[in-house]
Each structure stands twice: as C-alpha cells, then as structure tokens.
C-alpha cells in the first residue's frame, strides 16, 4: 500500500473503502493464480496486489493492481450468455467494444461456484456504483496472463 500523504474526506473514504474491499476480494478470488498456474506462466509463486492512492491535479486516484491472470472478455461474454444477461450477439459486440469493462454488468460472475467472496455477480457492479455516487469513475486495464489494474478516479473537492 502506497500513499503520498493524500487525505480523503470521510464520505469519499467510506466509498473507497467499500470499493477496495470488493476489488481486493476479486483479485484474490479471480485474479491471483494458484502456484502451479503461476509456475507454468513463469511467475513467482506468490501473487502481488498493490494499492496506491495519489492526488493528480483536481482528482484523487486509487489504483488497485494484481499480477494475476487478467480478465478475458470472451469468458465474460460466455458467462453473460449462460446467465441470460446478454444474447450471444450482444455479448460478442460488448466483448469487442468494451472488453474487460463488461465486468461491471449486473449479475455477471465467472466463478463456477458461489462462495463468501465470489460468484454472486454484485461486487464489481457495487464498485462502479460506489464510485459513481461520489462523482467519480472506474477504469479497468488488463492483459491476459499478466495483470489487472483498476483506477478509481474521484473528484478532490
């Protein structure tokens, strides 16, 4: 965890805390691979998750990144179709146009089973809702087999 001394208003802090809880759970449940998969990918056996909070001009950025398997838009599309969230045509189009941002679709999860930390398809939608309610936005960047990075951009005001 890194911060350059950035202070957050209590309202923003609560929203960031809730969003970070979901992001960290997702990184653990979906992102960081097991030892065998990491070994096969040439990675260190221990996964890495970092959180950085910084001020940039009139915004506060909260960056949460893992060195896991990344997000597969095609897998998201298949899950959206199998759960009846999208038609096959809409899922293909969204995967091509939105890529990993499909992760914010309501009810979407790629988890095979429901656990205490994954599988209900509400966490990432909640992240987006929390940050939007604070006047911010969520950006997602990913590369299959390498990393996923979420950037929460919040107004400093």
Please give the residue ranges for each predicted region.
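Conserved glycine-centered short motifs in functionally critical loops
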Residues: 2-157
